[in-house]
Regions:
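Phosphate/nucleotide-binding beta-alpha loop and adjacent structural elements of enzyme active sites
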Residues: 1-189
Length: 189
């Protein structure tokens, strides 16, 4: 039986794309077309230029512009729904205030987790990876947990940019009978 992955939040340097080399099929979901289009295409992998959200529609995303990425490659592909006044990361303190390192804004397409699963006839998920710079827990909570057959076998979710992320996400996953292992930036369940 073929294995299925879903990766929400990607870039062009740290993806699950290589799983296709081992016979997996999957979905790489990221609204930043500039980086999504740089990922080499693999048979059996769908590349969706959207963001997962609570509703289908459009939304402003904040991202690191090229001048920031040119100085610090760690910001390549970094984007978030969370505005500067609601986050404690992604800025540099300067005299008199803050410089937002995610100052670019773009209107992007959104869709729900449930819609993507329905539209692409996804019947199982072997590996779910979520890395969305602070919106990770919201996406995890939007998963259709009522469908027991879809329950991901393995989950990797970033907690680093979520306020109280490690404890809240750990409890949420444990409440769904997962065993959770924590690393500095990510949780595995």
């Amino acid at each position: 039986m073929e294995k299925i992955f879903i990766e929400i939040g990607s870039c062009d340097f740290d993806t699950l794309n290589h799983f296709a080399n081992e016979g997996w099929s999957g979905f790489i979901i990221d609204p930043m077309k500039k980086y999504l289009n740089n990922i080499p295409r693999k048979e059996g992998v769908q590349y969706l230029p959207i963001a997962i959200d609570h509703v289908k529609g459009e939304r402003i995303i904040h991202y690191a512009e090229d001048n920031i990425v040119g100085k610090d490659k760690d910001f390549a592909g970094m984007s978030t729904f969370i505005p500067l006044n609601e986050r404690n990361w992604g800025f540099r303190n300067v005299e008199g205030g803050k410089i937002d390192l995610l100052s670019g804004e773009m209107l992007i397409q959104t869709d729900t987790f449930r819609n993507v699963i329905r539209d692409y006839s996804i019947e199982r998920i072997d590996f779910l990876k979520i890395d969305t710079e602070g919106y990770d827990f919201e996406i995890l909570k939007s998963f259709p947990w009522d469908n027991v057959l879809l329950r991901p076998k393995i989950i990797k979710v970033e907690h680093f940019h979520v306020v109280n992320g490690m404890s809240e996400i750990t409890k949420y996953l444990e409440d769904r009978s997962y065993h959770v292992y924590a690393e500095v930036h990510d949780l595995y369940a």
